Amino acid sequence: MATSTLPQVPYKVGVVGYGRLGQSLVSRLLAQGSELGLELVFVWNRDPGRMAGSVPPALQLQDLTALEERHPDLVVEVAHPKIIHESGAQILRHANLLVGSPSALADQTTEQQLLEASKRWGHTVFVARGALWGSEDISRLDAAGGLQSLRVTMATHPDGFRLEGPLAAAHSSGPRTVLYEGPVRGLCPLAPRNSNTMAAAALAAPSLGFDRVIGVLVADLSLTDMHVVDVELLGPPGPSGRSFAVHTHRENPAQPGAVTGSATVTAFWHSLLGCCQLTSRPGIHLC
């Protein structure tokens, strides 16, 4: 259950990943943490040199397996799905986990490992909503048994993609090219850093999940400074037979070639604050 204020005793937070999103979170925690009842206890990055000159040496964690020594209450992952695959279950032994790369959960083995660790140690797997607009409404409709279909399209300039496998060799055939259209589970390993919005949608709608939520990835040469996310869902039919429908269109400003849009950074900060106000409970929960 949420409390009305952040904890009076400093709530200890560790950050895993020091890219654009990690840098923003660390900066805010250092500047505002004390007044919010939060204490940054470590920052880890695969390349430690990236932290030099900006993260106080005492906060730099060289070995992620030693995070227990910092006694975190919450570990925030903003690095890469590989961190969740490799270390997510171990992190849950010591702290709650805020997953910034939910595409990792498309791997069923990883999802099961996190669920088992969460139940064993009594810690929560939080998943940041990120760029997904309307996640609570999606969850409510799904819980009521009314969600019939869910489709998430993410479009941006090709320079904003970090693709793997067969998609890495994909080329735009015109000003707007559909690179992938199909189940989110199939997209996540091919575009692990560009499918997090779709993954969050799959988690918001467990009746459909990763296999029935449809993800569409579009390369659009005109979108040099933004990410565009369209969420389309169908609900139950009305008396006339016409189905309930929602379509949201979100334009998120972004630096050219950036993976993370500007509004997503702010949304993630609020997800972090929200996690700190919730009591630990086993399972995977959007935040």
UniProtKB/Swiss-Prot annotation:
Keywords: Phosphoprotein. InterPro entries: Asp/hSer_DH_NAD-bd, Asp_DH, L-Asp_DH, NAD(P)-bd_dom_sf. GO terms for biological process: NAD biosynthetic process. Pfam families: Asp_DH_C, NAD_binding_3. GO terms for molecular function: aspartate dehydrogenase activity; NADP binding. The keyword Repeat does not apply. The modification Phosphoserine is found at residues 24, 172. It comes from the Eukaryota. PANTHER family: ASPARTATE DEHYDROGENASE DOMAIN-CONTAINING PROTEIN (PTHR31873:SF6), L-ASPARTATE DEHYDROGENASE-RELATED (PTHR31873). Belongs to the L-aspartate dehydrogenase family. This is Aspartate dehydrogenase domain-containing protein. It comes from Mus musculus (Mouse). The gene is Aspdh.
